[in-house]
Amino acid sequence: MNALQWSFRAQCLTGFLFCTGLLAYAIFLQLHQGLEPCPLCIFQRIAFAVLGILFLIAGLYNSSNVYTRKAYGLLIFLTAAIGTGIAGRHVWVQLMPHNTISSCGSPLSFLSETMGPFEVFRTVLTGTSDCGNIDWRFLGLSMPMWSMFWFVALALLGLLVGFKAERRKPLFS
């Protein structure tokens, strides 16, 4: 069965299931494998959660209005683009030599208690050497590289579900 021909609802719920699976695997690695997430990892998880919620709402609402579907597709694409940017920054921090990145910063909980939300976001995006550690690889790619791959794939899925031309029923059948 061709997934490109699935209904709007099926494609959105598939996107939701992918986001849920990615988050579940990240939590599994944290709780059972002992991989503690850095602040950039947490922001990527938040982006996957928001993506999953958008896919779920779009799939459950299942609007037949073309403009509503385009709005969902655009929101999903923009959220995935933000996630891609965060993951890209994380990959860049990992690929930089460790002595060029500032020393380990404070934990995210401490930052959120002492700073405003925008300052926390700016501080986290500067990256710490903690974010530069590569603790996990699969097929030669680190976790942020895989996150970036999935953000791009989900962005393309968002564009597909939002801007896919609907088949018109024949006038005479």
Swiss-Prot record:
Residues in the Cytoplasmic compartment per record: 1-11, 64-70, 165-173
Keyword set includes Membrane: yes
Topology within the bilayer: Multi-pass membrane protein
InterPro entries noted in UniProt: DiS_bond_form_DsbB/BdbC, Disulphide_bond_form_DsbB, DsbB, DsbB-like_sf
Cellular localisation: Cell inner membrane
Keywords: Cell inner membrane, Cell membrane, Chaperone, Disulfide bond, Electron transport, Membrane, Oxidoreductase, Redox-active center, Transmembrane, Transmembrane helix, Transport
Domain of life: Bacteria
Gene Ontology biological-process annotations: protein folding
Transmembrane region(s): 12-28, 47-63, 71-88, 146-164
Pfam families assigned: DsbB
UniProt cross-references to SUPFAM superfamilies, sorted A to Z: DsbB-like (SSF158442)
Positions in the Periplasmic compartment: 29-46, 89-145
GO molecular-function term, one example from the UniProt record: protein-disulfide reductase activity
GO CC annotations, alphabetized: plasma membrane
Disulfide feature: C38-C41, C104-C131
Chief location bin: membrane
Entries under PANTHER family matching the protein: DISULFIDE BOND FORMATION PROTEIN B
Family indicated by similarity: Belongs to the DsbB family.
Purpose: Required for disulfide bond formation in some periplasmic proteins. Acts by oxidizing the DsbA protein.
Protein name: Disulfide bond formation protein B
Species for this entry: Xylella fastidiosa (strain 9a5c)
Designated gene of the protein: dsbB
